[in-house]
């Protein structure tokens, strides 16, 4: 039996995975910023900017929380782990200095941009899920602004930037894959 893949409708489990992983990502971002601000306080060179980004991520997370509740989507079982890991990543990069904190933001947001773009491509294949599509488009633009602001704030001047950025991006890709399923 062959299947027509010309305009495949995303199945409910696929949409639930999208919502689950996106909520987990936004939650993780809030924890990264909390960790950075715990180290930098409100006097660091980028503290106000980080606090603003954190507030935006809280808004994103709240909207995904609401969508999960509406649709009965379970959160990732790894949320407690992502809470600790995100906070540790934020605090650790802030301890390396303000440029490293910005490198963390740039790396994470680069991966989230790619991830959201992949999801939007999948949703565009079908035309289904206009509410989810609009949210992802809006949030992707915010994440791009965060990435660009981090780069403008000196992310690439962080110690061992290519290595730091590469490791963070690899960790993000792994977290995305795991959170889709678990």
What feature does the model see in each segment?
Residues 1-182:
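Non-heme di-metal
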């Amino acid at each position: 039996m062959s299947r027509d893949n010309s305009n495949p409708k995303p199945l409910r489990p696929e949409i639930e995975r999208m919502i689950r992983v996106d909520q987990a990502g936004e939650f993780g971002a809030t924890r990264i910023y909390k960790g950075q601000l715990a180290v930098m306080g409100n006097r660091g060179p980028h503290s106000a900017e980080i606090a603003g980004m954190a507030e935006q991520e809280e808004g994103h997370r709240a909207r995904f929380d609401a969508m999960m509740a509406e649709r009965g989507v379970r959160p990732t079982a790894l949320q407690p782990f992502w809470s600790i890991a995100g906070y540790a990543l934020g605090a650790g990069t802030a301890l390396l200095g303000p440029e490293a904190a910005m490198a963390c933001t740039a790396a994470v947001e680069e991966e989230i941009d790619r991830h959201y773009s992949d999801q939007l491509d999948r949703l565009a294949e079908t035309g289904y899920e206009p509410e989810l599509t609009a949210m992802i488009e809006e949030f992707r633009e915010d994440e791009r602004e965060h990435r660009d602001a981090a780069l403008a704030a000196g992310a690439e001047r962080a110690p061992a930037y290519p290595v730091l950025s590469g490791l963070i991006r690899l960790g993000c890709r792994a977290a995305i894959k795991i959170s889709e399923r678990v």
